[in-house]
Amino acid sequence: MKFKKTAACLAGLAFATGVVAKESNVGIFGTSGKGMGDHTYIAQDGPKADNIREVLSNVTLPEGFEINLYAIVPDARDMAMAPQGTALFVGTRKDKVWVISDRDRDGVADEVKDFAPSLTFDVPNGVQFTKDGFLYIAERNHVRLFPAAEYFFEGPDVVAVDI
C-alpha cells in the first residue's frame, strides 16, 4: 500500500513539476521533444508467418490442446500484459519495446509496433506493470516509468519518467 502511494505521489510530482529526465534526449515531462516520429510496424502475414504456422502444425500436443501463432515480434525477451488486457508489451535485448494489440480479441495480433519510438531504449529487456497501471521498463543502465502506457501506446511520444 505504501508503495502504491509513493508511486502515485512520484507520478503526480513528475506531472506537476515537469520532471526533466536524466537523458539528454528526453525533455520536460519525459517526452523526447523530437516530435511525433514514426512507428515501426511488423507484418503479421506473409512467408515468415506461414513458415511458423507450418512448424506449429507439426507440434504434437495432448488431446484438447492447440497451438497457434499469436504474433511475430523481433527479439522478444520479456512480456507484460496491460492490466485492462488491451495490449501486450514486449521487451528486447536490442533497442525497442514492442506493443501488441489484439483489438478484436480473437487470439491473434492485429498490430505489432514499437512503443514510444521518439525515445531511445538501451536493452529494454524488463517490462512490468503495477496493479495500478504504471509500466516500468528496466534497461541496461536505468529504469523508466510510463504512467498510463496502456492508454497512450497508440501515439509515438509518451510520458516517461526516469527512476
Protein language model regions, located:
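Beta-propeller domains with acidic blade repeats across secreted/periplasmic ectodomains
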Residues: K22-I163
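Gram-negative bacterial Sec-dependent N-terminal signal peptides
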Residues: K2-V20
